[in-house]
Regions:
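N-terminal low-complexity, intrinsically disordered segments
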Residues: 1-90
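Compositionally biased, low-structure terminal segments
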Residues: 6, 30-31, 100, 107-109
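Short, flexible beta-strand-to-coil junctions
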Residues: 72-73, 98-103, 158-162
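Short glycine-rich, basic-tinged beta-strand/loop micro-motifs
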Residues: 85-104, 151-155
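Ampiphathic alpha-helical segments that act as solvent-exposed interaction surfaces
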Residues: 107-142, 147-191
Length: 191
């Protein structure tokens, strides 16, 4: 599996407001760490069970992370750097990840250590036509006392194949490998 990380903290880069909402009737933030039953409210988790399993695992109590947002999709648009997979199709997803410990959300060093550790573990997994990228971004945490400027991670994952079914299957396998890497890191932190 290809695995890499990046830092995007410029003024034009993506940010996250937490909690977030797309309007009264639209999608919104659900605190799955503290209310796991709300997983049933997330359309993407219902549409793609593999993503639902990943969200449940990441938000499980002993884990050091929790999720804020997600999506998944299939496309036949292959970027030049993805041509190495020799695929006609890709299935992709993103999940926005937050540290569960409040203080860790404001530590760039902890975010950087985490993305380095995850990418190191993923580079050791068996060869699979998949690519993961973790991006450190700015998050604005809205709390009772105002807004605090911190960080979060966007985790992109793509599986590649000759058709959508094969690409999705490879994406699902890669998603389990990432889940296992996060569990290993969490086990080391909680030991």
């Amino acid at each position: 599996m290809e695995a890499d990380f990046a830092v995007e903290l410029g003024p034009q880069d993506e940010t996250l407001e937490l909690p977030w909402s797309a309007g009264e009737e639209g999608p919104r933030y659900y605190d799955l760490k503290r209310q796991p039953e709300l997983l049933l409210e997330i359309e993407e988790a219902r549409a793609w069970p593999e993503l639902g399993e990943f969200l449940a695992a990441v938000n499980a109590s002993p884990n050091l992370l929790e999720t804020a947002k997600c999506d998944a999709w299939a496309t036949s648009e292959i970027n030049p750097e993805e041509e190495i997979f020799g695929a006609a199709c890709k299935f992709g997803s993103y999940v926005d990840l937050l540290f569960s410990p409040w203080a860790s959300r404001f530590s760039f060093m902890e975010h950087e250590q985490l993305v380095k550790r995850i990418t190191q573990l993923l580079k050791r997994v068996p060869e699979i036509p998949a690519a993961a990228e973790l991006i450190i971004r700015r998050c604005f945490y809205h709390a009772t006392g105002g807004v605090e400027d911190g960080f979060y991670l966007t985790f992109y994952l793509f599986g590649y194949g000759d058709d959508e079914a094969q690409a999705r299957q490879r994406w699902g396998i890669a998603l389990k490998l990432v889940e296992n890497a996060i569990r290993q890191i969490a086990a080391g932190v909680n030991a």
